[in-house]
């Protein structure tokens, strides 16, 4: 088998891992249609880049400082869970238990070396060689109105819980679990976003999980990109805290999953407002094993996953370092630039060469026109005019 054949097979495996379904088009067709594909909303990430270090922020000096990736999960009333790398591994499709064992071994090895990641799973993964879990488990709990944590909690003692929000019944379950569990509770709102964020946070949820792939299939976000979902989710959380007494210990986090399966996308998602990125188990295994010629047994996959995550850690530290930050979580939309008007509108990202968002430019023109014509509009009316112009 030559290298070209291997590449085709690996690309097909990655496609299967990402979508859960086989390919229905040939790679040759994809190459021919590349210009058309790049013009679609699904590739807006390619039009967003991080700018270099500013004069007001000296470049990162490796001799004097280190880049912190740490993130604490848990609000003021909850027990905190700290991740050394802002990633949580989660299962997006059913995969073989042996693959989960490999992830378990890799996460343990990472934790032993000070690189703690989280895992979202319905079950606790054990192996015959290493039964003790050394990383935080966020256990998925069933949406049963009469559900109790006692039985599940005794079995696995998870550091956190994950609840999928479906309807008002889910809110009752959250209320019950909040009374029983003192660790962080994350609520997946992918099926109902952008609704109920404020209510869920008021009931004590420690964070929101959003799968951009699911949300962009909803009617509200049809034709939009993950950039818009992340930006709107961050705004929803920020709006919840407006007018409230500032408290550094009360920080609900945003976990973004879905279309964030590379180091570059992880950094861009963080700049747009994600505190933690959900990295799918299937994509993790597929990416880490992409260039390996070794037999895919549990140990070799675990080693590949371990090395892949260390490589990813190095990559996501590099960009904030170039921006002059010592804390990964200090990056923001102002550190990004885009050549796409759509990306600028959806993510409130400044345009390249102008350093202002497209919306800011339109707002300036509208305000000048209103002033020249002597038109009197209040703030709400002005915003309505802007929305009609930019198509929001």
Where are these regions (language model features)?
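Aromatic/hydrophobic pocket-lining residues that form π-stacking "cages" and hydrophobic walls in ligand
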Residues: 107, 233, 316
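Conserved, well-structured core domains of diverse proteins
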Residues: 1-112, 117, 127-131, 152-153, ...
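Active-site-facing alpha/beta catalytic cores
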Residues: 77-79, 83-85, 91-199
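A glycine-rich phosphate-binding loop feature that marks nucleotide/adenosyl-phosphate handling sites
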Residues: 125-126, 193-194, 251-264, 324-340
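Short secondary-structure capping/turn micro-motifs that flank functional sites
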Residues: 126-128, 216-217, 285-286, 336-337
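Glycine-rich phosphate/ribose-binding loops and adjacent secondary-structure elements
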Residues: 158-307
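Internal helix-turn-beta structural module
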Residues: 298, 305, 315-318, 328, ...
């Amino acid at each position: 088998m030559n290298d070209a054949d291997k590449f085709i097979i690996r690309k097909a495996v990655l496609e299967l891992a990402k979508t859960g379904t086989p390919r229905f088009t040939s790679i040759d067709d994809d190459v021919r249609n590349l210009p058309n594909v790049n013009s679609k909303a699904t590739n807006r990430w390619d039009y967003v880049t991080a700018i270099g270090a500013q004069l007001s922020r000296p470049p990162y000096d490796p001799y004097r400082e280190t880049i912190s990736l740490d993130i604490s999960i848990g609000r003021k009333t909850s027990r905190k869970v700290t991740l050394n790398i802002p990633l949580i591994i989660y299962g997006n499709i059913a995969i073989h238990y042996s693959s989960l064992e490999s992830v378990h071994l890799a996460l343990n090895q990472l934790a032993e070396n000070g690189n703690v990641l989280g895992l979202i799973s319905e079950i606790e993964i054990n192996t015959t060689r290493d039964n003790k879990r050394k990383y935080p488990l966020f256990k998925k709990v069933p949406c049963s109105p009469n559900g109790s944590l006692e039985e599940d909690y005794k079995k696995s003692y998870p550091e956190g819980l994950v609840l999928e929000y479906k309807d008002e019944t889910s809110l009752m379950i959250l209320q019950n679990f909040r009374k029983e569990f003192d660790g962080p509770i994350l609520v997946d709102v992918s099926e109902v976003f952008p609704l109920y964020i404020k209510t869920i946070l008021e009931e004590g949820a420690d964070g929101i999980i959003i799968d951009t792939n699911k949300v962009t299939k909803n009617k509200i976000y049809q034709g939009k990109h993950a950039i818009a979902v992340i930006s709107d989710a961050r705004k929803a959380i920020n709006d919840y805290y407006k007018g409230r007494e500032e408290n550094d210990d009360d920080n609900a986090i945003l976990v973004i999953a879905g279309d964030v399966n590379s180091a570059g996308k992880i950094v861009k998602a963080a700049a747009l407002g994600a505190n933690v990125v959900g990295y799918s188990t299937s994509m993790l295994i597929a990416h880490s094993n992409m260039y390996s010629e070794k037999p895919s047994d549990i140990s070799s996959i675990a080693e590949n996953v371990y090395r892949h995550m260390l490589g990813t850690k190095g990559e996501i530290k590099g960009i904030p370092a170039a921006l002059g930050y010592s804390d990964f979580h200090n990056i923001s939309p102002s550190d990004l630039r885009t050549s796409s008007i759509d990306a600028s509108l959806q993510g409130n990202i400044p345009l390249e060469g102008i350093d202002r968002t497209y919306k800011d430019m339109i707002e300036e023109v509208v305000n000048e026109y209103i002033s020249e014509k002597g038109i009197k509009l209040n703030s709400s009316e002005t915003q309505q005019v802007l929305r009609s112009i930019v198509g929001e």
